[in-house]
Amino acid sequence: MTATLERRESASIWGRFCDWVTSTENRLYIGWFGVLMIPTLLAATSVFIIAFIAAPPVDIDGIREPVSGSLLYGNNIISGAIIPTSAAIGLHFYPIWEAASVDEWLYNGGPYELIVLHFLLGVACYMGREWELSFRLGMRPWIAVAYLAPVAAATAVFLIYPIGQGSFSDGMPLGISGTFNFMIVFQAEHNILMHPFHMLGVAGVFGGSLFSAMHGSLVTSSLIRETTENESANAGYKFGQEEETYNIVAAHGYFGRLIFQYASFNNSRSLHFFLAAWPVAGIWFTASGISTMAFNLNGFNFNQSVVDSQGRVINTWAGIINRANLGMEVMHERNAHKFPLDLASVEAPAING
């Protein structure tokens, strides 16, 4: 009898836990994805803060020349970063227990792998939590689908690119100047500015900013006034009101006359779908571009391919970019190799005599 009561009590405790996790009445929805999201993001955030402040220098290139990234080792907020895991580790899974000591783990950049892998798992769970809450509230799943774009972008730079390049040392450093360094090196080695998917990503981000500004300004300019002239028009809105808060017909008419009729949406649902889909598609293209360039399917290279009828090279802006890429690559890992890989791979001319 006692055993039966204990089983019922334990079952009820588990049942109450399940109800609490999946309840939409909580101030913050937990969800089953949240059960995994919370510890992984807490771990990533905690290690990031500690490492950014106090981590010792990391031998990123695997040549016994450690690079400092933390505040206590001479950096500031701008120059500080979590230095990627050493090239000596490559793509090996490198938890603390795989190192001979904590000092060795820190020297080889173990915190970077820990932070990145926990972060990627955490943001993926956040996306799943968005879907889970939408499902329980009877909403459509497109919030999670839109969030998939930045998740894909983060996965591309922190996981897919290192896999393609053969080492976590090629991943993006976790810091401001480290991000810029990653961008410059990426341009030098892959010519990303000449990649169509990057161009589409730029169109998505800047186009999304433009469309959001246009939409917000049109809505703000065509509010249905519910207040007197002495009060702010914003005070006329009540949360949850059934009435329209702005006149879409007026906004449509204004923009249609400003550009042309069919440049303006007359369907609010189509308009907001477009506002969401445009930047999301752009970020997807960028993430796809990073993932393909990870395996060295690089941007266009018109290297001396534009010639006149006599075969003479016509200098173009593409040639200027190629020269800039070589210059940036010379400066990258300057102690690891003395020449750009593009030059070092060329066979030396034969010398007779």
UniProtKB/Swiss-Prot annotation:
Maturation and modification: Tyr-161 forms a radical intermediate that is referred to as redox-active TyrZ, YZ or Y-Z. C-terminally processed by CTPA; processing is essential to allow assembly of the oxygen-evolving complex and thus photosynthetic growth.
Main location group: plastid
GO BP: response to herbicide
Sites marked Cleavage: 344-345
Positions carrying Phosphothreonine: 2
This protein's name: Photosystem II protein D1
Entry function: Photosystem II (PSII) is a light-driven water:plastoquinone oxidoreductase that uses light energy to abstract electrons from H(2)O, generating O(2) and a proton gradient subsequently used for ATP formation. It consists of a core antenna complex that captures photons, and an electron transfer chain that converts photonic excitation into a charge separation. The D1/D2 (PsbA/PsbD) reaction center heterodimer binds P680, the primary electron donor of PSII as well as several subsequent electron acceptors.
Binding-site residues for chlorophyll a PD1, renumbered to this chain: 198
Domain of life of the source: Eukaryota
Pfam families: Photo_RC
Residues annotated to bind [CaMn4O5] cluster: 170, 189, 332-333, 342, 344
Residues binding Fe cation: 215, 272
Source organism of the structure: Aneura mirabilis (Parasitic liverwort)
Keyword terms of this UniProt record: Acetylation, Calcium, Chlorophyll, Chromophore, Electron transport, Herbicide resistance, Iron, Magnesium, Manganese, Membrane, Metal-binding, Oxidoreductase, Phosphoprotein, Photosynthesis, Photosystem II, Plastid, Transmembrane, Transmembrane helix, Transport
Residues spanning the membrane: 29-46, 118-133, 142-156, 197-218, 274-288
